[in-house]
Amino acid sequence: MNNDKLQRMVENLSEEKFGRTFRHCAYFNKRLRTTGGRYLLKSHDIEINPKQYEHYGEDAVVKIILHELCHYHLHIAGKGYQHKDQDFKRLSQQVGAPRFCNSIESYQQRANYEYYCTKCHAKYIRIRKVDTNRMRCGHCNGKLRMKRQLK
């Protein structure tokens, strides 16, 4: 799927589900890592993570588009477009837009460091490096040591 097909898909879904036209751009952004898509407030564009399409197919992209279109149409209408707003919750439920998308990588796959407690030997896996002089074990307050670097 390319950006032109994505643009047409967004325009069609906007007409079908919301009864309103989508007048801005929708495109894939390969720099998105932890989110399925995002609605840009200043430009009103919608960005979609291409990895979602590669991993889960067109059905997942449709769900992400519906979610982002909820943000889009509510923001354009001047209503509450944030996840916490009742307008957003109501509209997303009406059109069947999910609150979350499937994650591409689990936390375990993204982890770079493995630590252990010197006292109780509890294991901690982290994406970012931890300052072992400041951080302590959450179970017994023991000292942490790096066991290995995973990547």
From Swiss-Prot:
Keyword tRNA-binding set for record: no
Cofactor binding remark: Binds 1 zinc ion.
Domain SprT-like: 6-147
GO CC term, one of those recorded: cytoplasm
Subcellular location: Cytoplasm
UniProt xrefs under SMART domains: SprT
Binding site for Zn(2+): 67, 71
InterPro entries for this protein: SprT-like_domain, SprT_Zn_ribbon, Uncharacterised_SprT-like
GO function terms (MF aspect): zinc ion binding
BP GO annotations: response to stress
Protein name: Protein SprT-like
Main location: cytoplasm
Named cofactor requirement(s): Zn(2+)
Active-site residues from the entry: 68
Keywords assigned: Cytoplasm, Metal-binding, Zinc
Family per record: Belongs to the SprT family.
